[in-house]
């Protein structure tokens, strides 16, 4: 089964209170956190969408997001991060490592 999913996330302040949303033709999800960042909310929306797809046994999914951070992270940076033990090229920990690992695990199921 093929599935299109639309996600978004935002925060008021960075950090600040934030929320995320997921919309598809078969489900809608939303949530938030009191003290978070825009990027974490963008990623949480995608993470929740992937969790729902796994739960519903949806094998192919196309996720639409306006976040260049997430797009580049998933399509370009994540391969290098994994190879480097979740460290950047400068040797520091990848920001939002916990969410990147969860997203990577789910997208490979």
PLM segments and residue spans:
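Acidic, metal-ligating active-site segments
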Residues: 17-24
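A broad, low-specificity signal marking well-ordered, structured residues that form hydrophobic/aromatic
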Residues: 5, 20, 29
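A short, polar/acidic, helix/strand-boundary loop motif
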Residues: 25-42
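RNase H catalytic domain
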Residues: 4-17, 47-109
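Post-transcriptional modification and biogenesis factors for structured RNAs
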Residues: 1
């Amino acid at each position: 089964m093929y599935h299109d999913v639309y996600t978004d996330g935002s925060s008021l302040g960075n950090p600040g209170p934030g929320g995320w949303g997921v919309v598809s033709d078969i489900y809608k999800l939303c949530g938030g956190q009191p003290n978070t960042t825009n990027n974490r909310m963008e990623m949480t929306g995608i993470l929740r969408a992937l969790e729902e797809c796994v739960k519903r046994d949806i094998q192919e999914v196309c996720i639409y997001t306006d976040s260049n951070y997430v797009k580049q992270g998933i399509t370009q940076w994540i391969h290098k991060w994994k190879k480097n033990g979740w460290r950047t090229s400068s040797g520091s920990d990848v920001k939002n490592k916990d969410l990147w690992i969860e997203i990577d695990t789910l997208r490979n199921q």
